[in-house]
UniProtKB/Swiss-Prot annotation:
The gene is CAB22L. The keyword Transmembrane helix applies. It holds the Pfam family Chloroa_b-bind. It is found in: Plastid, Chloroplast thylakoid membrane. This is Chlorophyll a-b binding protein 22L, chloroplastic. Chlorophyll b 4 binds at residues 166, 177. The lineage of its organism: Eukaryota, Viridiplantae, Streptophyta, Embryophyta, Tracheophyta. Chlorophyll a 3 binds at residues 138, 148, 215. Chlorophyll a 4 binds at residue 218. Chlorophyll b 3 binds at residues 158, 174.
Length: 267
C-alpha cells in the first residue's frame, strides 16, 4: 500500500519529476492531520469470473449489444446497462453506487421485517400487530407499543420519543459510516471489513467479489419487493403473506391486473 501511494504521488515527464499529489507535510500543515483514508478502487478480479470484466454477463445476455465505455465491469452489479447515462460522470457514478448499496441493505432488512412477523404470527407466535403497515400505529393505542409483544423489552407510548431515538441511533450509525469509524481509519465505507466481518467472509478475494455481486442482486430484488409491498398496502391494506394467500386461493380475482382495473382508494 505504501509503495502504491509513493508511486501515485510522483511521476516523470521528460526526465523531470512531476508531483501528482501533495506530500504528507503539505497535507498536515501545522501539525494537524486527518486519519481518514479514501476508498481504493475495486481490485481486479480474475478473468474467470462471469460477473466482472469486459466479458461479464450483460443485462440481455448475447443480445445486449455494446456496453457504454465507462461501464468496464470493474464493480459488482455492472451489467452494461445505462440507457439514461447516469453513470457517465465518475463522481455521480460513485455517489449513486454508494446510495444503491446502502438502499439495497436497508431493503433486504425491510423485506425481512415485513415478512417474518406475519410468518411467525401465522405459526402461533403472538405479536401485538404482525402486519408491517399497521404495526407502527399501535403506539397510539391505549396500552402503547410493546416490542415483540413483550412489555418488559421496550414499552413505547410516545411517538416523539421513538422519533428522537431513531434520529440519534441512525445518525450515530450513519455518522460512523461516513466518517470512516471513530478514528477515520476505514478504507472503504461500503465494505469496511474488520469487526463488520466477524465470520471472515472477505478473507478470500475471489469469494468476496462474488459475495458483492450476490449482495447487489439480492438488494435490487429486495428494493423491488419493498416497492411491491408499498403498492399492496395502498391497494389492499394487507400484509404480503395475506395477499399471497388470497392470490393462491383465488388467482383469477386476486392479482395485480384485477386490482389495477378495479382499484378504488380505500376509505
Amino acid at each position: 500500500m505504501a509503495a502504491a501511494t509513493m508511486a501515485l504521488s510522483s511521476s516523470t515527464f521528460a526526465g523531470k519529476v512531476v508531483k501528482l499529489s501533495p506530500s504528507s507535510s503539505e497535507i498536515t500543515g501545522n501539525g494537524k492531520a486527518t486519519m481518514r483514508k479514501t476508498a481504493t478502487k475495486a481490485k481486479p478480479v480474475s478473468s474467470g469470473s462471469p460477473w466482472y470484466g469486459p466479458d461479464r454477463v450483460k443485462y440481455l445476455g448475447p443480445f445486449s449489444g455494446e456496453a457504454p465505455s465507462y461501464l468496464t465491469g470493474e464493480f459488482p452489479g455492472d451489467y452494461g446497462w445505462d440507457t439514461a447515462g447516469l453513470s457517465a460522470d465518475p463522481e455521480t457514478f460513485a455517489k449513486n453506487r454508494e446510495l444503491e448499496v446502502i438502499h439495497c441493505r436497508w431493503a433486504m432488512l425491510g423485506a425481512l421485517g415485513c415478512v417474518f412477523p406475519e410468518l411467525f404470527a401465522r405459526n402461533g407466535v403472538k405479536f401485538g400487530e404482525a402486519v408491517w403497515l399497521k404495526a407502527g400505529s399501535q403506539i397510539f393505542s391505549e396500552g402503547g407499543l410493546d416490542y415483540l409483544g413483550n412489555p418488559s423489552l421496550v414499552h413505547a407510548q410516545s411517538i416523539l420519543a421513538i422519533w428522537a431515538c431513531q434520529v440519534l441511533l441512525m445518525g450515530a450509525v450513519e455518522g460512523y459510516r461516513v466518517a470512516g469509524g471513530p478514528l477515520g481509519v476505514v478504507v472503504d465505507p461500503l465494505y469496511p471489513g474488520g469487526s463488520f466481518d466477524p465470520l471472515g467472509l472477505a478473507e478470500d478475494p475471489e469469494a468476496f467479489a462474488e459475495l458483492k455481486v450476490k449482495e447487489t442482486k439480492n438488494g435490487r430484488l429486495a428494493m423491488f419487493s419493498m416497492f411491491g409491498f408499498f403498492i399492496q398496502a395502498i391497494v389492499t391494506g394487507k400484509g404480503p403473506l395475506e395477499n399471497l394467500a388470497d392470490h393462491l386461493v383465488d388467482p383469477v380475482n386476486n392479482n395485480a391486473w384485477s386490482y389495477a382495473t378495479n382499484f378504488v382508494p380505500r376509505k
